[in-house]
Amino acid sequence: MLNIVLIEPEIPNNTGNIGRLCVGTESRLHLIHPFGFQITDKNVKRSGLDYWVHLDWKEYQSVEEWMTQIPDLSRVFLMSSHAQKSYYENQFQDGDWIVFGKESVGLSQEILQKFPNHLKIPISPLVRSYNLANACAFVIGEAKRQLIK
């Protein structure tokens, strides 16, 4: 099972879509406060549709609280547009943690410094960033492809 981590998500529709993606790929979703919405927000539920009741998810009050749940810090991969290595080059394993930052600014330097593994999604210089839910779909899809082999 993959562990998908959203640190301080801001947009309920993205979180709902990612929740549905996690149900479909049998991944666990980890949400780290603060959020830009309430989990009960109708937009989260609408985007996740009726799948939200099947979602395997956990929430944490802080990054530090979440970090206590990680058995092997070397299997944590932070998604960052500033990373040198593409997620295509990574060898994913069952149980890996794939971490995404907030929609507006990504991951803070403080968080990036806590983990050595940073990955990027290749992107045209004409585009600043991908939508968070789309970025999750890219990376989860590649990780699942590798795990099925």
Give short role names for the model-derived ranges:
Residues M1-I4:
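Extreme N-terminal starter segment of soluble prokaryotic enzymes
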Residues R28-P34:
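Short internal beta-strands
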